[in-house]
């Protein structure tokens, strides 16, 4: 599929500090042996996330592109995705065999969503540190993303978050849509996320 229709484009969104860059790093490392992978990161005025991924050695630097969105980062993934589409087109020209491109959004609120013109699949990342009530607060990221990742589960006892409550609320808010608890520090949950992307992305 990727060779015929271009690479599978996977949007990764979520609030600041939820673990988007850590997830992107882990997914790149889990998939790079089998697939040709690249990343586009979005930051408001810097290329900090792209530089972090290079430091983490997620991928060779020529496969990681940082775009500076200015203003509201959600605009660059939704209303006017041209800056990201251009970055993907440039990557595709340089690396014609691309199978997967991860698009990491700038940290934003629960209302941020990806334009269907930009992302084939979307992952929304929240952290238990943001409060156990986050899943039930809803918002497009919680309810409409293809996969919800509830990250930093290991910190739940320290922030007073009940994972059982979060699981119940996520199941209710998302109906049949899947969600995964994860701990990116230890890599817990990464295998399930890769499996989801492989199956639902047609890889």
Curated annotation (Swiss-Prot):
GO MF terms, alphabetically ordered: GTP binding; GTPase activity; nickel cation binding
Pfam families hit by this protein: cobW
SUPFAM superfamilies: P-loop containing nucleoside triphosphate hydrolases
Keyword presence, Lipid biosynthesis: no
Subunit and interaction comment: Homodimer. UreD, UreF and UreG form a complex that acts as a GTP-hydrolysis-dependent molecular chaperone, activating the urease apoprotein by helping to assemble the nickel containing metallocenter of UreC. The UreE protein probably delivers the nickel.
Matching NCBIfam families: ureG (TIGR00101)
Protein name, entry field: Urease accessory protein UreG
Lineage: Bacteria, Pseudomonadati, Pseudomonadota, Alphaproteobacteria, Hyphomicrobiales
